[in-house]
Amino acid sequence: MQVTFLGTSSGVPTRARNVSAVALRLPQRAELWLFDCGEGTQHQFLRSDLRLSQLRRVFVSHMHGDHVFGLPGLLASLGLSGNSNGVDLYGPDPLESYLQGVLRNSSTRIGYPLKVHRVRDAAEQNLIVFEDKDILVRCTPLTHRVPAYAYRVEQKPKPGHFNLERAQSLGIPPGPVYAALKRGEQVSLDDGRVVDGRDFCGPDRPGASIVFCTDTVFSEAAVSLAAGADLLIHEATFAHSEAEMAYQKQHSTSTMAAQTAAEAGVGKLVLTHLSPRYAPGNPVTPNDLLREAQAIFSNTILAKDFLSFEVAPRCNSS
């Protein structure tokens, strides 16, 4: 999985940072997933190496404008391109009526299947939001001024490495049989033997896990959702000195994000959703927020627009 930050500012864009959007590229399935879609996100796509035509799913944290104002235009542009097989959207209850209203009142025809999934029940009941043979997605309610949700994306474990030499030594013929054994399945051979793929594969290889957490003040629910994740993307709207304002506005400080990462035992923390007040040259800068967080959780980095990197399970990392 590859993460690309398309917007890392809170509230309004700045010259250096657009508002919230994070892309998750899944190369093995030629898909792109998007987490939030602030105004101008489709322009950020044009400045990146991402392909909008690969967009398959959009996960919306909450309905504040800096997280959703870019969505109607992006979906409309995807429709004009004529090469989408459909998009599934996941988010708060008002998401569907918001999109329907904008598209209807602007006489916009999408031209491809568009389905909206409400996540409130899944979040409150700890149910799975999305699952297929490779990936599952969970979510949890956050603490914000409007209903907001954090999302966790997990790759399912894959069978361990196949012991080819052992299969050959037992006279198992190559071909489709090997493919089934690699999947850990039981196979009946032509000579009557039944072999179990699990006997030919090493331990399962864990998949990577990513948590997207915004907007919220410090939340125990977020700690639970992020437990053991390889990557936590967490809002850090305010510096520690603005903790009182953070509580009032129900946003996180840099230290709240770091506390979440530390308590959850994640592999890496990325700070995003930074207030424009912390622009370089001001009394407090983004690097100050980074230092505050690193004092609590050392493996913390600062997001910037177009930052992109691969996310791998920690046990497979160098």
From Swiss-Prot:
Coiled coil: none annotated. It comes from Prochlorococcus marinus (strain MIT 9313). It catalyses: Endonucleolytic cleavage of RNA, removing extra 3' nucleotides from tRNA precursor, generating 3' termini of tRNAs. A 3'-hydroxy group is left at the tRNA terminus and a 5'-phosphoryl group is left at the trailer molecule. Zn(2+) 1 binds at residues 62, 64, 144, 215. The keyword Kinase does not apply. Homodimer. Keywords: Endonuclease, Hydrolase, Metal-binding, Nuclease, tRNA processing, Zinc. This is Ribonuclease Z. InterPro entries: Metallo-B-lactamas, RibonucZ/Hydroxyglut_hydro, RNase_Z/BN. Its EC number is 3.1.26.11. Belongs to the RNase Z family. Zinc phosphodiesterase, which displays some tRNA 3'-processing endonuclease activity. Probably involved in tRNA maturation, by removing a 3'-trailer from precursor tRNA. Binds 2 Zn(2+) ions. HAMAP family: RNase_Z_BN.
